[in-house]
């Protein structure tokens, strides 16, 4: 941004487009300066996620998104539940290449911001401190119930995956339910004792 705070350049990503450089000037419409990815994207099958929100069993609203294979919403699809890491991170409005790849291969992909995610206030984020696998797990299972009821999903072909905290939750899920037909845990926490003192984020998540 400029020293007088009247001009700024930035990169912007949308759910269906990779990052491009934009320009903002005070009092003027924002302007896209680059089109680096137009040719590449024109050769790909990109699908836009649909936002949904459901009321959890404790009365709180939980945000989620679902993607379907391009131009294919009438038939039932196998689905993959994606769980983010952190858990102090959050899904939002952006293009996620692995989700697009799975959708292009015929899978529906759904993902939510359960308790423990950032962007919803400290109470939401800290709800899982010392209680991993409790309210967060309930949010994810209730999201799955909601998705299977509302969307054309083949409930006999639903998988789950995630990395880091998402990998921990994948492990937790397969240890507590048989509803998923496949699971892939990535860079996960599988042992809290060995994880203590060896994590790349230090010996504690945050200072209480």
Where are these regions (language model features)?
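Acidic/polar loop patches that form or flank catalytic/metal-binding clefts of enzymes
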Residues: 30-32, 74-76, 154-156, 181-182
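Glycine-rich His-Gly loop
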Residues: 13, 82-86, 164
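Flexible loop/turn segments at secondary-structure boundaries
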Residues: 16-19, 30, 40-41, 60-62, ...
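Short substrate-entry loop that stabilizes the transition state in hydrolases
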Residues: 72-78, 82-121
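Structured core elements
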Residues: 9-10, 53, 61-66, 80-82, ...
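Active-site-proximal cap/loop segments of hydrolase catalytic domains
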Residues: 111-208
């Amino acid at each position: 941004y400029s020293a007088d705070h009247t001009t700024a350049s930035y990169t912007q990503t949308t759910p269906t487009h990779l990052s491009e450089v934009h320009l903002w000037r005070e009092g003027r419409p924002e302007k896209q300066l680059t089109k680096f990815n137009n040719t590449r994207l024109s050769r790909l099958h990109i699908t836009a996620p649909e936002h949904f929100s459901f009321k959890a069993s404790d009365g709180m609203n939980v945000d989620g998104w679902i993607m379907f294979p391009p131009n294919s919403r009438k038939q039932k699809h196998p689905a993959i539940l994606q769980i983010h890491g952190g858990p102090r991170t959050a899904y939002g409005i952006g293009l996620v290449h692995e989700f697009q790849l799975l959708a292009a291969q015929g899978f529906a992909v759904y993902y939510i911001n359960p308790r423990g995610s950032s962007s919803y206030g400290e109470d939401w984020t800290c709800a899982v401190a010392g209680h991993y696998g409790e309210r967060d797990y309930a949010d994810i299972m209730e999201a799955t119930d909601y998705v299977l009821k509302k969307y054309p999903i083949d409930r006999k072909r639903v998988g789950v995956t995630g990395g880091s905290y998402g990998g921990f939750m994948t492990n937790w899920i397969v240890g507590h339910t048989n509803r998923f037909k496949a699971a892939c845990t990535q860079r996960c926490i599988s042992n809290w004792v060995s994880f203590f003192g060896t994590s790349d984020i230090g010996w504690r998540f945050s200072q209480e």
